[in-house]
């Protein structure tokens, strides 16, 4: 399979803000994981997916009330039982990401034990190959 980009957009409302009047990091993290889960669930049954680690969730600028938080996610690495998803957030028509990072999910059976998923990733774009290299170096 080739990486496929999934889009997940959210309107930043007053209840999403922190004491500085910008998007609360906790809300950002929640949406970040949801965006990653959507990509993972495109390849595996949702009931079999568990999040095991968020890697390097990095913010580069604040997000203001009324802005549209546009998340993009895609599977960028597969292991025997795991898959790693790259997620980035861009604010409406901004080119540079406001937030980016990786999430590792594991495929589990009905007892919650890791089980092989059989997924194989085919990387063709320069960006995907670069992101895959970064994902290989995650702890």
Question: Where do the language-model regions lie?
Answer:
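Hydrophobic beta-strand-centered segment that forms part of the acyl-chain substrate-binding groove
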Residues: 3, 23, 37-72, 76-83, ...
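Generic structural detector for well-ordered beta-strands
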Residues: 9-13, 58, 104
């Amino acid at each position: 399979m080739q990486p496929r980009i999934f889009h997940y957009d959210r309107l930043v409302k007053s209840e999403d803000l922190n004491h500085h009047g910008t998007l609360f990091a906790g809300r950002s993290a929640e949406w970040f994981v949801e965006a990653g889960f959507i990509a993972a669930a495109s390849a595996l049954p949702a009931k079999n997916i568990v999040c095991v680690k968020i890697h390097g969730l990095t913010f580069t600028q604040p997000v203001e009330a009324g802005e549209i938080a546009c998340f993009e996610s895609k599977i960028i690495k597969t292991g025997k039982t795991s898959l790693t998803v790259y997620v980035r957030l861009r604010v409406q028509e901004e080119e540079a990401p406001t937030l980016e990072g990786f999430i590792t999910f594991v495929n589990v059976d009905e007892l919650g034990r890791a089980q092989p998923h059989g997924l194989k990733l085919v990387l063709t774009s320069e960006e995907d190959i670069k992101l895959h290299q970064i994902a290989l170096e995650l702890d």
